[in-house]
Regions:
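Formylglycine-dependent sulfatase
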Residues: 2-8, 12-148
Length: 148
């Protein structure tokens, strides 16, 4: 065997084993995004609130990501939700007040999650008048647009 064979054979074996190995499944994190309405950080003990003890929320906050510096770009419920869903300011996403109708055809983070293979759902207050899009399952409170 010549010198080139000593180099070529091991490299070929390594290359073939790399090609034949199965693709390792990438572990994706579970994502639970909780959005509440009209309460301050004082309403949860994980943010230092003393009036209420919220041990289950505390556990979720301690084991996951707790957002400590979040600011609403619109003070109204519906428009604020539309901004969070789209990542766009109200004048760009078209939902400027609580009487607006949300255009669900635009890109939203639930649609991006679906495209990445996640199952998505929303339960509770929607407040965007139209039916939710980008969710595999939804169960929303109806009539929220009249409440302002």
């Amino acid at each position: 065997m010549n010198r080139l064979s000593y180099i070529f054979l091991p490299l070929t074996a390594i290359g073939m084993s790399a090609c034949s190995s199965g693709k390792e499944e990438v572990k994706r994190p579970n994502i639970i995004f909780m959005m509440t309405d009209d309460h301050t950080t004082q309403a949860m003990s994980c943010y230092g609130g003393r009036f209420l003890q919220t041990p289950n929320m505390d556990r979720i906050a301690n084991e996951g990501v707790r957002m400590d510096n979040c600011y609403a770009v619109n003070a109204l419920s519906g428009p604020s939700r539309a901004c969070i869903l789209t990542g766009k300011f109200s004048h760009i996403n078209g939902f400027t007040d609580n009487a607006s109708t949300f255009d669900g055809n635009q890109q939203t983070f639930p649609k991006l999650l679906q495209a990445a293979g996640y199952q998505t759902s929303i339960v509770g207050k929607w407040h965007l008048i139209t039916e939710p899009q980008g969710f595999d399952y939804w169960c929303i409170l109806t009539g929220q647009h009249e409440q302002g």
